[in-house]
Regions:
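Intrinsically disordered, low-complexity regulatory segments
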Residues: 1-166
Length: 166
C-alpha cells in the first residue's frame, strides 16, 4: 500500500561523533530535546488484523458479530465496547491491549463435543480478534471483502504514532 520500495520512509540525521565532557564517545548519542519534541525520529506503526468467516464440514460456519454472553469464552462487556452492530470496530476508535476489534464466534472445535454431550448445534465459542500485547493506537481503516473461496473477509488496520523515549 505504501510502496516503500519507491518512496522510502525515514529521516536523514547528521550527527557528529566526539567526546563530550571527557566521556567516552562509544557510550551514547546525545540529541537536543527540542528536536525530539518537534518530531525527530517519530514513526507510525501500522498493523493489519484479518478475520475470515470460515466454512466447516457439516454445514457449520463462523459468524462475525458481537458475541452473546452464552458463548464459551465470552469476555467482559467492556472488551466489546468499540464494536458496532455488525461486530466490527468503528474507524477512528482509540484501542488498547485486549480490546476486541472484530467480534467472531465459531462452532465447537471438534464435532465429538456435540455428540458426546448431546448439545445443540448452536453452541459456539468466542474467537474474536483482539489488540495484541504491547500495542495500542487508532483504527485507521476497515475493509470488507471476500476471500478466494468466497468467504467474508474483514481487515482492520490500526495506526500507532511512536515517539522515541528519552
Amino acid at each position: 500500500i505504501a510502496d516503500y520500495d519507491k518512496h522510502p520512509a525515514g529521516q536523514n540525521v547528521t550527527i557528529a561523533v566526539m567526546s563530550y565532557e571527557g566521556y567516552n564517545m562509544q557510550d551514547s548519542i546525545i540529541f537536543n530535546k527540542g528536536s525530539i519534541d518537534r518530531g525527530l525520529a517519530r514513526s507510525t506503526y501500522f498493523r493489519t488484523y484479518t478475520v475470515e468467516e470460515l466454512r466447516y464440514s457439516g454445514g457449520l460456519v463462523d459468524e462475525i458479530c458481537i458475541p452473546d454472553k452464552e458463548v464459551k469464552g465470552y469476555r467482559s462487556e467492556k472488551d466489546y465496547k468499540y464494536l458496532e452492530d455488525d461486530g466490527i470496530v468503528y474507524t477512528g476508535a482509540t484501542v488498547k491491549i485486549d480490546d476486541v476489534i472484530i467480534g467472531k464466534t465459531s462452532p465447537p472445535r471438534f464435532l465429538g463435543e456435540l455428540e458426546e454431550f448431546s448439545i445443540a448445534a448452536d453452541m459456539r465459542r468466542e474467537s474474536s480478534a483482539v489488540i495484541k500485547q504491547g500495542e495500542e493506537g487508532k483504527i485507521d481503516m476497515t475493509i470488507l471483502t471476500e476471500s478466494e473461496e468466497g468467504n467474508k473477509l474483514v481487515q482492520v488496520k490500526t495506526r500507532d504514532h511512536r515517539i522515541p523515549e528519552i
